[in-house]
Amino acid sequence: MTSRNYLLLTPGPLTTSRTVKEAMLFDSCTWDDDYNIGVVEQIRQQLTELATASEGYTSVLLQGSGSYAVEAVLGSALGPQDKVLIVSNGAYGARMVEMAGLMGIAHHAYDCGEVARPDVQAIDAILNADPTISHIAMVHSETTTGMLNPIDEVGALAHRYGKTYIVDAMSSFGGIPMDIAALHIDYLISSANKCIQGVPGFAFVIAREQKLAACKGHSRSLSLDLYAQWRCMEDNHGKWRFTSPTHTVLAFAQALKELAKEGGVAARHQRYQQNQRSLVAGMRALGFNTLLDDELHSPIITAFYSPEDPQYRFSEFYRRLKEQGFVIYPGKVSQSDCFRIGNIGEVYAADITALLTAIRTAMYWMK
C-alpha cells in the first residue's frame, strides 16, 4: 500500500473532495440527537427532495454496499405470492436475477444481452402474456458496459399495467436529472459512493411510502428488512436498527452540500456529460474504439475495446497508468475483451486532458 493518492476513473468508489474526506474526522454517537436528527434525518429529507417534488415518498438508509439495498428491496417488496420481471443487460441485472433465485422469489428474467438496449415492445409482450407478474425491476445505468437503459419507457409500461416498479439507479442518481414520481418509480436504489460523491458504507432507498408500508412481514432477512429499517428511522428520529456507519454518513452530508454548491444535479450532469464526451473523443483520437454506439452511452462510464496488438496486456497498461496517478477499471463484458474508464467523482475537464496524455504515454505496444 502506498500513501499516494490516485485519480479514480471508476464508477465508484470514486475520487472525493478533500472536504468530504475531512468530514470523517469527527466522531459521532449513534443514539445522539445531534447525529440522528441533525444529520441522518436531514439526509433522508434531502434525498427525497432530490428524487421528486411530489408528496408520498420517503427514504431509508441501509448499511452496506448498493447490492445490500437491492437485495433488501427485492426481499422486502415482494410478498410470497408476487412475481418480478427482471430486465437484465449486464452484470447488475444478472445479480438481481441471482438474488431472486437465492431468496426463492418467483421471477421472469428478460436477458437482452450485454450490448443491447432492452426492447420495450418485448417487455410489453411479457407483461401482456403473464398477468402473475406484479413487479418490474431494472438497472438504469448499467456500468458493465456504460449503457443507459430506458427507465422512462419501462416506467410507462409499469404504470399502464399497474406493476410495482423497482429501479437500481446506483450509478445515476445524483448525476442524471430524474423525477421518480413522473417516471412511476416505486423504489429507487442508490449508494453513498456514486454520483453524490460520498464514500462507501451505506446505500439508500427512496420509496413510495404507501408501497413501503405494505412490506411488513415480507422480508427474507433480519438485517435486510427494509420495512423494519424504515420504521426504526421513522419512529426514532433517524436512528438505525444496527450500528450506523457514522463517518460515512458525515461524509455524505458534506457531499450533499457540495452537490448543491455545484448547482445541483443538472450542473453535475452537465459536467459528467462533458467529461464523457471529451474522454471518448480523445480515446478515439488515440485509436481506441467504444464498445457501444454513442446513443447508448451513459455519462458515467465508458467501455473501450482492448487493442488487438499481441503485446497488449491490460495489467501492464493499468500499471503504467497507475504510475502516472490514474486508476481505470478492467472489463466486465463476457463476450468482449475491453476495459472501462469512469468520469464521475471529483473529475473535471483538466483531469480528462491529463488522463489522455497519460494514456498516450502508457501505450507501450505502440513503441
From Swiss-Prot:
Catalytic function, reaction form: (2-aminoethyl)phosphonate + pyruvate = phosphonoacetaldehyde + L-alanine
Molecular functions per Gene Ontology: 2-aminoethylphosphonate-pyruvate transaminase activity
Record InterPro entries: Aminotrans_V_dom, NH2EtPonate_pyrv_transaminase, PyrdxlP-dep_Trfase, PyrdxlP-dep_Trfase_major, PyrdxlP-dep_Trfase_small, SP_NH2Trfase/AEP_transaminase
Residues modified as N6-(pyridoxal phosphate)lysine: K194
Enzyme Commission number, as recorded: 2.6.1.37
Pfam family, one: Aminotran_5
Assembly behavior: Homodimer.
NCBIfam families xrefs: PhnW-AepZ, PRK13479.1, transamin_PhnW
Reported function: Involved in phosphonate degradation.
Family: Belongs to the class-V pyridoxal-phosphate-dependent aminotransferase family. PhnW subfamily.
Protein name according to UniProt: 2-aminoethylphosphonate--pyruvate transaminase
Record organism: Salmonella newport (strain SL254)
Name of encoding gene: phnW
